[in-house]
């Protein structure tokens, strides 16, 4: 029963979903959207490598025409004095690093850099690298400083300076545009004092901006490099022209700046001409044609009154018909591009590939239980929500939004509701959904697996039960081991006594057996002896000895007396 006077069923906006893969290259965005996979962002893939260095000369004081009459611009003198005091520590730090590098051998040069860093109180690897860069760039900075006079004389905002060593630099006059448009024509007019005040106010604002941008460099130039974002502030509108003219690339200037890959380092300051030489490190960029890095957002989906969450990578690389997982951990991610030094993609399984291509029967889902889950996502002005797990209401027009039992998620655009309420959260819908979504999807029971570290109810209970049983067995084993240790001496004595008793028993039994055998043998011998005596006596009776007829017996010899 509907609770509002304006009931609506989103199933009228849907058609049946086929699980066949979508035609064309790339992932099946329409099919995946029905099971809770939403594409939130697509970016181009850029590769970059360490490039060469360029140099920028920043004029800390604009070129001014000579004032007419006896007009004395005291504001410029005060500005120069303040700026010199401000930059003196920076110049001393640079001199400390560079002067310690005057030794001839390479080993001494490196030792000089370390000594210079020790004098500045820094010692990290990044700071050593920055200091070495300052030393290496000092020769180029010296060549650039020799051209300071020619730089001072020009009135152009950007001018190319080429020394005898073909060192290329770009001379920037940060506030020259203001001078050209406001001050240059005004100095020839009357009222020098008002012009002096106007120049002073501009220079004071510029000085405030200067101290804010170069604060870290003023403390220690080898501590942190100057970011291109800070450099753009001080260079103003001239920086895009520099980037586009000097560093030929198809990338947008804002994209380059937001990447943070363009860095600057102060390498020299000329106090006489009030000029600062900055070394700019510009990487080499190459775009991978046809490659897209896609961010995927997952929400829970409904499957026959069961809440499940699909298992897909949060970021993928889509190139032609190839799909890879892409973490981009070592890459720089900007709003429109991903800058990497190498391809960070990793292969995926065949089942996951088929799933991303639109074969939903190959997808793996995890059953989830809990209250604070990803049940909705807002992308491109359209709301994707699992209304089987959340209370979905529309405030404009007022109604309850229902979700069919066979539908995975609900898609809400401006044609359905202009303001949607998800439990206690309110969202404004601003865009029209231009994709047809299905009302249901089929899923094999084997495709539901417990994978992610969510609240998995029964599975978690089984794991806890197994752990408790294992802990109980371990406790029993420990108790038995303790008892065995305490009874070790008793068990040893008892074992020895038992062994002696067994040996004695064996010896006794052996002696008895030997005695019995000897007795039997003696009895047999006695019996055999008796039989032999009886036999001989009987034989003598039956066979008496023969009569003796010898001569002696017939004629006895007379005895002599």
From Swiss-Prot:
Keyword annotations:
Cleavage on pair of basic residues, Coiled coil, Disulfide bond, Fusion of virus membrane with host cell membrane, Fusion of virus membrane with host membrane, Glycoprotein, Host cell membrane, Host membrane, Membrane, Signal, Transmembrane, Transmembrane helix, Viral envelope protein, Viral penetration into host cytoplasm, Virion, Virus entry into host cell
Cytoplasmic side stretches: 517-561
Per the UniProt entry, what are the Gene Ontology biological process annotations, in alphabetical order?
Answer: fusion of virus membrane with host plasma membrane; symbiont entry into host cell
Topology term for the membrane: Single-pass type I membrane protein; Single-pass membrane protein
Localization (cell): Virion membrane; Host cell membrane
Annotated site location: Cleavage: 109-110
Which ranges make up the Extracellular topological domains here? Answer: 27-495
Q: Which residues form a coiled coil?
A: 135-163, 459-484
Q: Please outline how this chain is modified post-translation.
A: The inactive precursor F0 is glycosylated and proteolytically cleaved into F1 and F2 to be functionally active. The cleavage is mediated by cellular proteases during the transport and maturation of the polypeptide.
Which residues are tagged as glycosylated in the record?
Answer: 72, 80, 359, 434, 440, 464
Q: Which residues form the signal peptide?
A: 1-26
Which cysteines are cross-linked by disulfides? Answer: 71-192, 331-340, 355-363, 387-392, 394-417
GO terms for CC? Answer: host cell plasma membrane; membrane; viral envelope; virion membrane
Where does the protein principally reside?
virion
Where are the stretches annotated Fusion peptide?
110-134
The membrane spanning regions, by residue number, are: 496-516
Q: What function does the entry list? A: Class I viral fusion protein. Under the current model, the protein has at least 3 conformational states: pre-fusion native state, pre-hairpin intermediate state, and post-fusion hairpin state. During viral and plasma cell membrane fusion, the heptad repeat (HR) regions assume a trimer-of-hairpins structure, positioning the fusion peptide in close proximity to the C-terminal region of the ectodomain. The formation of this structure appears to drive apposition and subsequent fusion of viral and plasma cell membranes.
Subunit notes for this chain?
Answer: Homotrimer of disulfide-linked F1-F2.
Family statement drawn from the similarity comment of this UniProt entry: Belongs to the paramyxoviruses fusion glycoprotein family.
Q: What is this protein's record name?
A: Fusion glycoprotein F0
Organism from which the protein derives: Simian virus 41 (SV41)
Classification lineage: Viruses, Riboviria, Orthornavirae, Negarnaviricota, Haploviricotina
Gene giving rise to this polypeptide: F
């Amino acid at each position: 029963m509907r609770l509002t006077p304006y009931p609506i069923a989103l199933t009228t906006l849907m058609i049946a979903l086929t699980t066949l893969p979508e035609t064309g290259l790339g992932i099946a965005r329409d099919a995946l959207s029905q099971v809770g996979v939403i594409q939130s962002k697509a970016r181009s893939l850029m590769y970059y490598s360490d490039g060469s260095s360029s140099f920028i000369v920043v004029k800390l004081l604009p070129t001014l025409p000579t004032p007419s009459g006896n007009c004395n611009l005291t504001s410029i003198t005060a500005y120069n004095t303040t700026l010199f005091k401000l930059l003196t520590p920076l110049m001393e730090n640079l001199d400390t690093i560079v002067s310690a590098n005057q030794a001839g051998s390479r080993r001494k040069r490196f030792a000089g850099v370390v000594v210079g860093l020790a004098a500045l109180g820094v010692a990290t690897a990044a700071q050593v690298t920055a200091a070495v860069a300052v030393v290496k760039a000092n020769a180029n900075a010296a060549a650039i400083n020799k051209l300071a006079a020619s730089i001072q004389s020009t009135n152009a905002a950007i001018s190319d300076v080429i020394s005898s060593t073909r060192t290329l630099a770009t001379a920037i006059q940060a506030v020259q545009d203001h001078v050209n448009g406001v001050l240059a024509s005004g100095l020839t007019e009357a009222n020098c004092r008002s012009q002096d005040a106007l120049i002073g106010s501009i220079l004071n604002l510029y000085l405030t901006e200067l101290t804010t941008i170069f604060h870290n460099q003023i403390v220690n130039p080898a501590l942190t490099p100057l970011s291109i974002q800070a450099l753009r502030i001080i260079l103003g509108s001239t920086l895009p022209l520099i980037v586009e003219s000097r560093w030929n690339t198809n990338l947008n200037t804002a994209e380059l700046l937001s990447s943070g890959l363009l860095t600057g380092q102060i390498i020299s300051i000329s106090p006489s001409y009030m000029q600062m030489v900055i070394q700019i490190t510009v990487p080499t960029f190459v775009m991978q044609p046809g490659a897209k890095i896609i961010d995927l957002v997952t929400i829970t989906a409904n499957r026959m009154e069961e809440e499940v969450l699909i298992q897909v990578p949060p970021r993928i690389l889509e190139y032609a018909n190839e799909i890879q997982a892409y973490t981009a951990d070592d890459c720089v991610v900007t709003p429109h591009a991903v800058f990497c030094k190498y391809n960070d993609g990793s292969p995926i399984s065949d089942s996951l590939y088929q799933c991303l291509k639109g074969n939903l029967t190959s997808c793996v889902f995890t059953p989830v239980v809990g209250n604070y889950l990803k049940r909705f996502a807002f992308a491109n002005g359209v709301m994707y929500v699992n209304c089987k797990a959340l209370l979905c209401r529309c405030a404009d027009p007022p109604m309850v939004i229902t979700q069919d039992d066979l539908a995975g998620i609900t898609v809400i655009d401006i044609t359905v509701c202009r303001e949607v309420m998800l439990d206690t959260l309110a969202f404004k819908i601003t865009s029209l959904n231009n994709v047809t979504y299905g009302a249901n999807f089929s899923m094999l029971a084997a495709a539901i697996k417990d994978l992610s570290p969510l609240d998995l109810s029964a599975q978690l209970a089984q794991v806890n039960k197994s752990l408790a049983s294992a802990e109980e067995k371990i406790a029993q084993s420990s108790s038995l081991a303790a008892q065995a240790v305490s009874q070790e001496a008793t068990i040893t004595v008892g074992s020895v006594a038992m062994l002696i008793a067994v040996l004695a028993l064996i010896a006794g039994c052996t002696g008895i057996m030997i005695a019995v055998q000897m007795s039997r043998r003696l009895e047999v011998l006695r019996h055999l002896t008796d039989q032999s005596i009886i036999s001989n006596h009987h034989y003598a009776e039956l066979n008496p000895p023969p009569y003796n007829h010898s001569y002696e017996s017939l004629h006895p010899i007379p005895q002599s007396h």
